Design a protein with these regions (language model features):
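C-terminal motif of bacterial Sec signal peptides marking the signal peptidase cleavage site
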Residues: 14-17
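Non-catalytic cap/lid and distal C-terminal segments of serine-dependent acyl enzymes
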Residues: 22-237
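Positively charged n-region of N-terminal signal peptides that target proteins for export
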Residues: 1-4
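Short, linear, compositionally biased motifs with a strong N-terminal bias
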Residues: 10-11
Length: 237
C-alpha cells in the first residue's frame, strides 16, 4: 500500500505539473522543451513539488472516468520478426464520449516484471490512482487527458531476460511509433489530424511518455528515438 501511495503521489504531481504548463502548439521562445538546468551543489536539495493526496481523493469521485482495454496488432521487432496481438489499458476521462474536444495523451510504462495493470489495476479491481485522477480532473486541477498503460513484453507476458529487460525497452520504440500510437490515435480523439507520420509529428506537443523503474529506462530510450513524436518525458525511480 505504501508503494502504491508513493506512485500515486509521483504520477499525479507530474500530471498536474504538465497541466500547469499546458500542452499547446505555442512556439514562443520562453516555452522551451528543455528549460535551463539548475546546478546542484553537494548536500543541496531541490523541491519535487510533491504533496500529500488530499483527503477524500482516493474515494470515488462524482464524475468518474473509466478504464478499458485497447487491442492492437504489432511485431516483436527482433530476431523472431513475429506478428502478435497485444493490448493496453486506457484511462478515459469523464465526459469524453459526449465531447468534441481533442485530448492530450500520456503513454505510461510499468517497471521490471510489471504489466498494464501496474498503475490502474485490473479492470474489475482498479487502484486508487484512477480515483485520484478523477478528482483532479473534476476539480479542474488537471486537464482531462487520455492515459495509455502499455507493456514492452511480447504478447503482454513477462519474460526472463539476461539484461533486466533493457533490450525489450529499447525495441519498444518501433512498436510505439509504428503500431501503438497510430492505431490508438486513429481510434480516439487526439490532436493528431490523421495517423500519417507528418500529422503524428505535428501533434508531438500533446504527448507525454512516462515510465517507472525499467519504464523510466524505456522513457530515456524514447527520448533518444521518439523525440519527433513526444514533447514531454517523465522517467522516475
Amino acid at each position: 500500500m505504501k508503494k502504491l501511495i508513493i506512485v500515486i503521489l509521483l504520477v499525479t504531481s507530474i500530471l498536474v505539473g504538465c497541466t500547469t504548463n499546458e500542452l499547446t502548439n505555442k512556439t514562443d521562445t520562453e516555452e522551451l522543451v528543455f528549460q535551463p538546468y539548475l546546478e546542484i551543489q553537494k548536500n543541496s536539495s531541490i523541491s519535487l513539488g510533491i504533496h500529500n493526496v488530499p483527503e477524500g481523493y482516493m474515494a470515488p469521485a462524482k464524475q468518474q472516468g473509466k478504464v478499458v482495454r485497447f487491442d492492437y496488432m504489432t511485431n516483436t521487432y527482433d530476431y523472431q520478426d513475429r506478428v502478435m496481438k497485444k493490448y493496453a489499458y486506457v484511462y478515459i476521462p469523464y465526459g469524453y464520449e459526449t465531447s468534441t474536444e481533442r485530448y492530450d495523451v500520456v503513454y505510461t510504462m510499468h517497471g521490471h516484471t510489471g504489466d498494464v495493470t501496474s498503475f490502474p489495476g485490473e479492470l474489475d479491481d482498479l487502484t486508487d490512482i484512477k480515483n485520484v485522477i478523477d478528482h483532479l480532473i473534476e476539480k479542474k486541477e488537471m486537464k482531462p487527458m487520455l492515459m495509455v498503460f502499455a507493456s514492452y513484453y511480447h504478447d503482454n507476458v513477462d519474460m526472463d531476460t539476461d539484461d533486466y529487460d533493457a533490450s525489450l525497452t529499447e525495441a519498444f520504440g518501433k512498436e510505439l511509433q509504428n503500431d501503438l500510437i497510430p492505431q490508438f490515435e486513429n481510434a480516439y480523439h487526439t490532436y493528431a489530424s490523421s495517423t500519417s507520420e507528418e500529422d503524428l509529428i505535428a501533434s508531438r506537443d500533446h504527448r507525454i511518455f512516462l515510465g517507472f523503474s525499467m519504464g523510466a529506462v524505456t522513457t530515456w530510450y524514447r527520448m533518444m528515438d521518439s523525440m519527433r513524436y513526444f514533447r514531454y518525458y517523465v522517467p522516475f525511480s
